[in-house]
A protein has these predicted regions:
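Acidic anion/phosphate-binding donor-loop and adjacent secondary structure
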Residues: 127-128, 155-159, 172-192
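Short, structured helix-loop element that forms part of the nucleotide-activated donor/catalytic region
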Residues: 46-49, 232-261, 349
């Protein structure tokens, strides 16, 4: 009999958690499972294509009367999800990110369905509201397995939430990187903004400007742009529409009034590998991470990378001075500017660091991490 697995996440918008959700679903589907990805939000928010063989279901929207209750309607939403699970009777459920995991664990309570939780950020630096923290403390011990991306995250979850057992599963790099639309050619797009082929380009990628430290990046670029008027900063992932009420593009433009012609926002793209290959340097000045997909992908693409040594993940990818540069998490804009200037002026050094970075293709290969994940699933459901 075909086993059924449900992966539950808020949406399939741009982001590392969403990509990993679809990757796990594909692995399970290719292993013979009937894999279903359930999201709270509909296809209008989708960015990533659903893999062949994976089902996609959107939770029924709340009736008008339930929407009137706002957060107070959460228990009813849990009961509706529980009823859906009773009807479909999956053999395994996986909750991706904190809030969907909490809701899924509550909905599964007492149904006898094995559950996996995948925390996607470093919990003490991305604190949910108090009610969610209390519910997380209550529910996380119920899960039969916790996927953790770093040892530090695993230690915190075990110490503070009694989240055991755990499987250490870093993000894999799928090489070559998947391609999908929109896929603007970086050279053509930049040329339309008067960026010449010989002009140097700094690249950053992310959808959450504060977490990714793009304000830090702007402060550093302000120093560099004064010295190098032909240097350009490209930030992928930020959209022109507000994010949680904040126009992130406009916010960054205001930080760089003298360099507005050197700051570029292509938005979301599905051919990010092409942009890594066009860039002279990839920069990740994040305040915190779970495990930085974009840094992993940039290194796999042979791009010379500079990252903050933030919690958690960059230090597990970069060996400073060997396969990239690792900056102190509290490094000043001037310190960043000095390191970036040195690398821009030394193509031989950039090439050496970029070549060494390619080892992530093997260290974090899909083959290795797929075997690890499927082994954990087999042990959980008793297939050993």
């Amino acid at each position: 009999m075909t086993r059924r697995v449900v992966l539950y996440i808020d949406s399939l918008k741009t982001g590392g958690a969403e990509r990993v959700t679809l990757l796990l679903a594909r692995w399970l589907s290719e292993d013979g499972w009937l894999a279903t990805v359930v999201t709270r939000h509909g296809a209008s928010r989708d960015f990533y294509p659903v893999p062949a063989g994976v089902q996609r279901i959107v939770e029924p929207s709340d009736p008008v009367w339930l929407r009137l209750f706002g957060p107070l309607g959460f228990p009813v939403r849990v009961r509706r999800l529980r009823a859906w699970l009773r009807r479909h009777q999956p053999d395994l459920v996986i909750g991706m990110t904190t809030l969907p995991a909490i809701k899924l664990l509550l909905a599964c309570r007492g149904l006898g369905i094995p559950s996996i939780v995948s925390e996607r950020n470093f919990p003490p630096l991305k604190r949910p509201g108090l009610p969610w923290r209390l519910l997380r403390r209550l529910t996380y011990p119920w899960a039969q397995l916790h996927l953790v991306q770093t040892q530090a995250t695993g230690r915190w979850l075990a110490q503070h939430l009694k989240a055991q057992p755990q499987l250490l599963l870093a993000n894999p790099v799928v090489w070559p990187l998947p391609r999908f639309s929109p896929d603007p050619d970086p050279n053509d797009w930049l040329a339309s903004r008067h960026v010449r082929p010989q002009d140097q380009v700094l690249l950053a990628v992310g959808t959450k400007a504060h977490q990714k430290g793009f304000d830090r990046l702007a402060a550093m670029f302000e120093l560099l742009s004064q010295r190098s008027p032909q240097l350009h900063l490209v930030i992928l992932g930020l959209e022109s529409v507000p994010y949680h009420g904040v126009d992130q593009q406009d916010q960054l433009r205001r930080l760089l009034p003298q360099a507005s012609q050197q700051l570029h926002f292509p938005g979301r793209v599905g051919n990010v590998q092409d942009w890594y290959e066009r860039a002279d340097l990839f920069l990740l000045p994040s305040r915190y991470e779970g495990f930085p997909n974009v840094l992993l992908e940039a290194m796999a693409s042979g791009c010379c990378c500079v990252s903050s040594d933030c919690p958690q993940g960059p230090a597990e990818l970069i060996r400073d001075g060997v396969n990239g540069r690792l900056m102190a998490n509290d490094a000043s804009p001037a310190e960043w500017a000095d390191v970036v200037s040195t690398l821009l002026a030394d193509p031989e050094l950039r090439g050496r660091l970029a070549d060494a970075a390619l080892d992530v293709r093997d260290r974090f290969s899909e083959r290795r991490l797929r075997r690890c994940f499927m082994g954990g699933v087999s042990q959980l459901i008793g297939d050993d």
